[in-house]
């Protein structure tokens, strides 16, 4: 089974192995590629640019629209003051239903009403530009461990008063399980579903963020990665 895996469903695929840690930063000598973590992460710097593109599958039943790319260099991310920022208050990412629908209207205004009558998703595609990743790897949460009480819709503003949209903030809880791909290579993409319009499913979104790994060598190359966010539509599903 490929290591490039969709990490947003209610159950972790068999290729992902969960491990309990003896203490927050003690890893076993025979640790597999996926490890359970309860450690803080810190904010990473990013430069964003819009990537407009539109394609349709040969069957005509699915369409997607890639609308955002985040080129992420991690230079400066090792500064001491950044290391004090907790995970839930820094770079943890997910998407609220209101914010997701707003994105559809923002990027596909003429087709939004029709597209949102069917099932819609937002899926992020994350890939390192330099590998293997040693500095600030990407971590994802097992969605089945995220309680609704820990999800908080959060307004986004520009210049303090101009409403830009809505995302979500997530409260930390000891029951949450986090995973990361150790030594991720440039040919290994991570697909992360951050929103799904279909109701009643357990894998509705996958929270994710970068974190400061305690075993990163001092001279490890700074991480560089690209992230593309895709709008996905299913015309024959509700």
Curated annotation (Swiss-Prot):
Name its species: Aspergillus oryzae (strain ATCC 42149 / RIB 40)
As one GO molecular function, the record gives: oxidoreductase activity
Cystines in this chain:
none
Its biological purpose is as follows:
Part of the gene cluster that mediates the biosynthesis of aspirochlorine (or antibiotic A30641), an unusual halogenated spiro compound with distinctive antifungal properties due to selective inhibition of protein biosynthesis, and which is also active against bacteria, viruses, and murine tumor cells. The non-ribosomal peptide synthetase (NRPS) aclP is responsible the formation of the diketopiperazine (DKP) core from the condensation of 2 phenylalanine residues.
Q: What is this protein called?
A: Aspirochlorine biosynthesis protein N
Extract the InterPro entries matched here: AsaB-like (IPR044053)
Q: Which gene encodes it?
A: aclN
Superkingdom of the organism of origin: Eukaryota
Concerning its family, UniProt says:
Belongs to the asaB hydroxylase/desaturase family.
Q: In which pathway does it act?
A: Mycotoxin biosynthesis
